[in-house]
Amino acid sequence: MKFEASSAVLLLIDMQQGFCGAQGSSGRRGRDVSVLKPSVESAARLLPVCRAAKIPVIYTRMAFAPDYADGGLLTAELRPGLKKNNDLRADMPDADIMPEIAPLPGDLIINKQRYSAVLRTELEPWLRARGRDCVIVGGVTTGMCVESTVRDLGQRDFKVFVVPEACGDFNADNQKRSLDVFALAFGRVVPEQKMIAAVKTGAADFAIDPRFDW
């Protein structure tokens, strides 16, 4: 799969206070948000390299309206605790991007109300209108919103390059399983340093993982 910086974007999924911050809703519910810190740090290393190469940066946030009218079945029945606890509201600190990777003017910030960043958002039309078909991906959590997004992008013929260090999950088994699924069927899993080198070079060919070359 050929990577070309001239047709690439960096997509950072849900690296926001609600999931990654100690005072965010996940932290308040007792989750160990420190396990996601390495992924934010990796994203912080990718950002300046991509910016220097003029690669657009896109952030997504899981962010609901104050009344959760846009939450559908997700907040009504699947995860009603989100609404009950006022979690992940667009008008509250939960929606804020982590300061280590703060957006700059001109970056695209997409609010989403479903796990996939493709579903019911402007992401796909924005990419197609600009001829950007190579998507470098990092984000949280790997087994939920990252996986939902990678699957949707891969099946829409976008070239997806997942940086494992820039992805984080509360569950290590979910992390490994999802990365294997990405490598098997939906894109390429490219270590951070190799991805940085490709961005600086401007292009690279990434072979299929030999475990799945059958």
Q: Model features per residue range: what roles?
A:
Residues 6, 24-50, 55-57:
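A short alpha/beta connector and helix-capping loop motif
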Residues 25-31, 75-83:
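Short glycine/proline- and charge-enriched loop/turn segments
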Residues 9-15:
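N-terminal nucleotide-binding beta1-loop-alpha1 segment
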Residues 62-74:
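A basic- and aromatic-enriched beta-loop-alpha substructure that forms the phosphate/nucleotide-
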Residues 55-62, 163:
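Short beta-strand segments at enzyme active-site cores
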Residues 1-9, 45-53, 70, 78-214:
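Active-site-adjacent betaalpha module
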Residues 18, 65, 169:
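Active-site loop signature of alpha/beta-hydrolase-fold enzymes
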Residues 16-22:
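Short acidic, Gly/Ser-rich segments with clustered Asp/Glu that frequently serve as metal-coordination loops
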